[in-house]
């Protein structure tokens, strides 16, 4: 049987937004993020990070450091008895400073590549899954793949929601104060 997943944006949703996070020491959980992910783990959802990492394309982050950043995030979550099942990222940007990353790809959110790859790898039923993030591209991604969309007001959430509404884009299914509130709402909706 296909499994359900929560596709999570990383920066500003799980960990504190610091601009271009480029070192494991900069990783700091947003309050209650670990509790939120633990609730989702306990409810049987796969938890999958899907993140644009344009800092790689812009030369602000070495791609080789990304595994260490994700290990640090996983270690912090482990202390709260929470886990991320997989990490998927896009290192590209159409205006990248580094030529090898300067492509118009299908993996950069809101394009569906990261979720399609994760779904194929992990046997995920996307129609029974959710995307949670703090940016308009996360909400557009959810709509593009047919998943539920929850926008959080941490990170860039408040600014991005205003821009999203101003552009008259399809709204999220729910707006939550933070990842914990988003998880609680999804668990109520998914009974």
Describe these PLM feature segments.
Residues 73-78, 119:
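Conserved hydrophobic residues forming the short capping helix/wall of the S-adenosyl-L-methionine
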Residues 127-174:
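Acidic, Mg2+-coordinating phosphoryl-transfer loop and its flanking beta/alpha structural elements
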Residues 173-178, 182:
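Short acidic-hydrophobic, aromatic-tinged amphipathic segments that line or gate anion-handling sites
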Residues 106-139:
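Conserved Lys-Pro-Asp/Glu-containing loop-to-beta segment of HAD-superfamily phosphomonoesterases
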